[in-house]
């Protein structure tokens, strides 16, 4: 059984032209299992799988420090 019990989707709006760079940066982060550039309201959607909500909070806090990210939303699976 996997120890990564918390699954979340992180959406971000980024500065124009930085979509691919930010998505690549996210994909290299620990516990980010997928990072996609999308069309529509959100520029990037990333899937995060981690051990607990405290670790998820730390990951989201670290992601939000990326200067090209201007707006975010996170959905946590039940």
At which residue positions do the language-model features occur?
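A compositional/biophysical signature of low hydrophobicity enriched in polar/charged and small residues
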Residues: 1-78
């Amino acid at each position: 059984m996997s120890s990564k019990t918390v699954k979340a989707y992180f959406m971000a709006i980024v500065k124009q032209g930085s979509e691919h760079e930010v998505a690549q940066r996210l994909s290299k982060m620990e516990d980010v299992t997928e990072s996609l550039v999308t069309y529509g309201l959100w520029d990037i959607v990333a899937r995060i799988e981690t051990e607990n909500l405290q670790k998820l909070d730390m990951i989201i806090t670290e992601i939000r420090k990326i200067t090209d990210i201007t707006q975010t939303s996170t959905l946590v699976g039940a």
